[in-house]
């Protein structure tokens, strides 16, 4: 792991631990409502827009099956009609440069994504995931709960899709844990991805968002499911 990235990760982990443990009682939850947009540095662009170079799998603990899947990728396939409007997986869509809106209710937290006009629904209040044989979708099935002032989201039932736009994919057995913590106008997401098929170990992503009160609605950017 790159030393600079490791140090940033350590700082972020410490921030989340302090924020989630120091604020309020269990029933005192923050309000995530409103529009948010990712905070990215120029060097992040290669991992978001066109994607990193083919063969650049640094930082990802790929299994033999995952490496074979990545090496079989053909970039021309992205331009096939059936793939042009294919939504990103939740493992990737949260890293999009497009903004999103959070609609917060006691029993449901909804994330309206401008990217491909996708909607993520986080079921609160002790809801369980559906049976394993339930059909998978691009956004999967998400359940959530509060740990102090941190929102913890667990997602399953995601259609096989790409983690990076250079062939790295996750299988339909992927499970995603997201931990969202707000500090004023900033929202920190710590994402852990586990996939027993294409990865040999869990891997983590850290993403920061800024509250955007200047945005009043999302622009149409349709994709099909």
Language-model regions, residue ranges each:
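Bacterial N-terminal signal peptides
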Residues: 8-18
